[in-house]
């Protein structure tokens, strides 16, 4: 890394130790952006529709609850303070010097174990049965895995910089708030982006490894069917709002060492104040939940066996009068004081097989694992 990048890492890691609310993110093809709130606390919301008209960096969970609210960072600083010893204002007209603070790790209970393969197999069996009975069309089964921190000098900021170099086609972010803790992710899936009435979302599903570093040209029926479920759902939700989108045919896209099928949807949304309504309709999409939505949403929460927290929620920048870029929170991890909690999932159809689905989650976790093992 360059001297400026090393200095930026020192500052960002210090902000995490100081329990500050901030976000650092990189949209594919653009430069990293930074936002930090030093006045007051990040806003906590308990309904997606409350995001109408809001501005800031949003961190939304899979399921909104008292334990996992929607968190909105309302920044008053948009440039990372890089001068050594620079004072950054705090609430109450106080200030602190970045390089003089003592380490205060966030108090977080480390899960005693991740979901082992045997547990995954049991969950898979409970998910496949209602699919074979045709109670549901699709379900998404996910799992977490807790990796003890091997070294005390792991730098979340350095991992972010490695991620933006390694995963140039993904949305990469690092964020921290007292309510959420520290999260790092590299996600390929837009849930909603756009400005000035022109909007974009995607139907992204189906997974294959790259073939000799290239996008695969052959896709089986299971992967195509899985992607079409997502496309159908998005089409239906937009049409329910009177929106007629322009849609592209499914095509393979790259996400790290994996590939997915993606359709793009472009559409007008004259009333930007209704973005919260649209997000409420889109989230969670069948790419992270299932069909039919409400029934599978409830089934997953009751039967998956763990709390997804902010994994498979959505994350990104909101600006009522400017550009918004919101992504589904995939290929991510929660960074604790002495461990990393990694998350991954995959779509299950009646034709799915346990071993291939397990291996898909293993492959997806490698996105974050590469960043951990580099230290």
What kind of region is each of these model predictions?
Residues 88-181, 187, 204-208:
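Intrinsically disordered, low-complexity linker/loop segments enriched in Gly/Pro
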Residues 134, 192, 232:
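Conserved hydrophobic/aromatic pocket- or pore-lining residues that grip, position, or stack substrates
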Residues 8-12:
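Intrinsically disordered, low-complexity segments enriched in serine and arginine
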Residues 59, 171-176, 314-315:
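Short, conserved loop-to-beta-strand elements that form functional interface hotspots
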Residues 269-375:
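Conserved hydrophobic core element of enzyme catalytic domains
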Residues 18-88:
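An N-terminal, globular interaction/scaffold subdomain
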Residues 82-118, 124, 148, 202-302, ...:
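Contiguous alpha-helical scaffold segments within structured protein domains
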Residues 19-32, 36, 150-229, 322-345:
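An anion-binding catalytic pocket shared by soluble metabolic enzymes
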């Amino acid at each position: 890394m360059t001297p400026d990048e090393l200095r930026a890492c020192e500052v960002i890691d210090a902000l995490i130790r100081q329990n500050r609310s901030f976000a650092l993110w990189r949209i594919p093809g653009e430069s990293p952006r930074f936002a930090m709130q030093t006045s007051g606390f990040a806003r906590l919301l308990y309904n997606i529709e409350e995001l109408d008209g809001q501005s800031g960096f949003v961190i939304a969970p899979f399921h909104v609850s008292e334990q996992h609210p929607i968190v909105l960072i309302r920044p008053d600083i948009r440039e990372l303070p890089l001068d050594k010893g620079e004072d950054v204002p705090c609430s109450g007209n106080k200030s602190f010097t970045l390089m003089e603070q003592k380490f205060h790790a966030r108090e977080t209970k480390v899960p005693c174990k991740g979901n082992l393969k045997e547990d995954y197999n049991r969950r898979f069996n409970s998910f496949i049965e209602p699919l074979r009975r045709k109670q549901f069309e699709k379900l998404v089964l996910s799992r977490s895995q807790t990796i003890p921190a091997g070294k005390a000098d792991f730098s979340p900021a350095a991992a972010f910089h490695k991620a933006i170099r390694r995963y140039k086609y993904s949305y990469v972010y690092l964020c921290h708030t007292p309510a959420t803790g520290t999260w790092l992710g590299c996600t390929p899936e837009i849930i909603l982006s756009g400005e000035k009435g022109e909007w974009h979302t995607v139907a992204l599903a189906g997974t294959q490894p790259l073939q000799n570093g290239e996008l695969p040209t052959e896709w089986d029926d299971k992967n195509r069917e899985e992607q079409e479920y997502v496309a159908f759902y998005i089409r239906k939700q937009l049409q329910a709002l009177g929106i007629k989108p322009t849609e592209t045919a499914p095509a393979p896209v790259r996400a790290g060492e994996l590939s997915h099928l993606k359709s793009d949807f472009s559409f007008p949304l004259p009333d930007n104040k209704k973005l919260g309504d649209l997000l409420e309709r889109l989230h969670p999409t069948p790419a992270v939940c299932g069909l039919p939505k409400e029934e599978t949403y409830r089934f997953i929460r009751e039967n998956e066996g763990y709390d997804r927290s902010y994994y498979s929620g959505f994350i990104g920048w909101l600006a009522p009068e400017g550009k918004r870029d919101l992504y589904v929170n995939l290929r991510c991890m929660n960074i604790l004081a002495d461990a990393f909690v990694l998350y991954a999932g995959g779509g299950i159809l009646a034709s799915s097989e346990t071993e291939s689905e397990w291996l898909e989650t293993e492959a997806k976790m490698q996105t974050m694992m590469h960043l951990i093992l580099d230290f």
